[in-house]
UniProtKB/Swiss-Prot annotation:
Family: Belongs to the Arkadia family.
Residues involved in Zn(2+) binding: 295, 298, 318, 321
Primary localisation category: nucleus
Gene Ontology CC annotation, any one: protein-containing complex
Organism this protein belongs to: Mus musculus (Mouse)
Keywords annotated in UniProt: Metal-binding, Nucleus, Transferase, Ubl conjugation pathway, Zinc, Zinc-finger
GO annotation terms (biological process): axonogenesis; forelimb morphogenesis; innervation; limb development; motor neuron axon guidance; muscle structure development; positive regulation of BMP signaling pathway; protein catabolic process
Record remark on domains: The RING-type zinc finger mediates the E3 ubiquitin-protein ligase activity and binds directly to free ubiquitin. Non-covalent ubiquitin-binding stabilizes the ubiquitin-conjugating enzyme E2 (donor ubiquitin) in the 'closed' conformation and stimulates ubiquitin transfer.
Protein's UniProt name: E3 ubiquitin-protein ligase ARK2C
Entry EC number(s): 2.3.2.27
Region (Disordered): 23-79, 268-289
Length: 347
């Protein structure tokens, strides 16, 4: 057994060591995996030095067996002194199986974190495609445990939102291309109808849950569509049409009085103009006197012999004018007293 000093770590190496005076050299094996192999010995293509077994803990790689077989056939004496070894930078290397217990537990913790991150990315394939293309090195394991342990992502990133893609990837807003709007959102833009919007809490929660996974630029586009004045004008027009249809279904609600009620509670007669006394003097023709009366509905002066109607409140109107008014409302146009209420109070 040889103790290899790697930075501040002391790693045991089992097996024979050839060319003990040769420097510690690193070479990369052309496997499809991200593992790197370390050889002890001079850089000779014919000789094979013992390698670290870098296969994954569960499955074995057949490409490593042929490469590792000659390493176990060498035997020799272990020497007590070793030449100083340069400090190696371990990056993207999985932990060997012969690590001490503390490092082995740390290695297992890293594997669990990587598996959890992989499951989270697989559960959201849309985010997985974008992120793997931009950061392909995130899924590679690393031997530098102190820097590889990643902090948990915020909740809004773990739930599948996509508006952090341009920031994560370092892209400018011009480079971040907006994807086409899905078909199930087209009807919100094509036909601005008020009945398309949800009116209860359950449907609102469903729409909010779907829009939460919606990209930010397209949400901005939806907000701009909501600021279009034509949409609000159309909504107001349709709301007024709905009120007209409701009025047709309910019918005309009449709050006026029928003709029999009008005749019963009012006093119709022929108007006779009051004459002023001669002692007070005569006024010029065309000038109104204090005794002249006016119909406040048509704003015309009352003339002698016209058909008038006096209400219980003693206000006087033209008969035709006040009959049309009382057919819509039973209250006096001036004092707003109901003709039936006034009669009942006096009696």
């Amino acid at each position: 057994m040889v103790l290899v000093h790697v930075g501040y770590l002391v790693l045991p190496v089992f097996g024979s060591v050839r060319n003990r005076g040769a420097p510690f050299q690193r070479s990369q094996h052309p496997h499809a995996t991200s593992c790197r192999h370390f050889h002890l010995g001079p850089p000779q293509p014919q000789q094979l030095a013992p390698d670290f077994p870098l296969a994954h803990p569960v499955q074995s790689q057949p490409g490593l067996s042929a490469h590792m077989a000659p390493a176990h056939q060498h035997s020799g004496t272990l020497h007590q002194s070793l030449t100083p070894l340069p400090t190696l930078q371990f990056q993207d290397v999985t932990g060997p199986s012969f690590l001490p217990q503390a490092l082995h537990q740390q290695y297992l913790l890293q594997q669990q974190l990587l598996e959890a991150q992989h499951r989270r990315l697989v559960s959201h394939p849309r985010r997985n495609q974008d992120r793997v293309s931009v950061h392909p090195h995130r899924l590679h394991p690393s031997f530098d445990f102190g820097h590889q342990l990643q902090t948990p992502q915020p909740r809004y990133l773990a739930e599948g939102t996509d508006w952090d893609l341009s920031v994560d990837a370092g892209l400018s807003p011009a480079q971040f291309q907006v994807r086409p709007i899905p078909q199930h959102y087209q009807h919100y833009l094509a036909t601005p109808r008020m009945h398309h919007f949800p009116r209860n809490s359950s449907s609102t929660q469903m729409v909010v849950h779907e829009i939460r996974n919606y990209p930010y630029p397209q949400l901005h586009f939806l907000a701009l569509q909501g600021l279009n004045p034509s949409r609000h004008t159309s909504a107001v027009r349709e709301s007024y049409e709905e009120l007209l249809q409701l009025e047709d279904r309910l019918g005309n609600v009449t709050r006026g009085a029928v003709q029999n009620t009008i005749e019963r509670f009012t006093f119709p007669h022929k108007y006779k103009k009051r004459r002023p006394q001669d002692s007070k003097g005569k006024k010029d023709e065309g000038e109104e006197s204090d005794t002249d009366e006016k119909c406040t509905i048509c704003l015309s002066m009352l003339e002698d012999g016209e058909d008038v109607r006096r209400l219980p409140c003693m206000h006087l109107f033209h008969q035709l004018c006040v009959d049309q008014w009382l057919a819509m409302s039973k209250k006096c146009p001036i004092c707003r007293v109901d003709i039936e209420t006034q009669l009942g109070a006096d009696s």
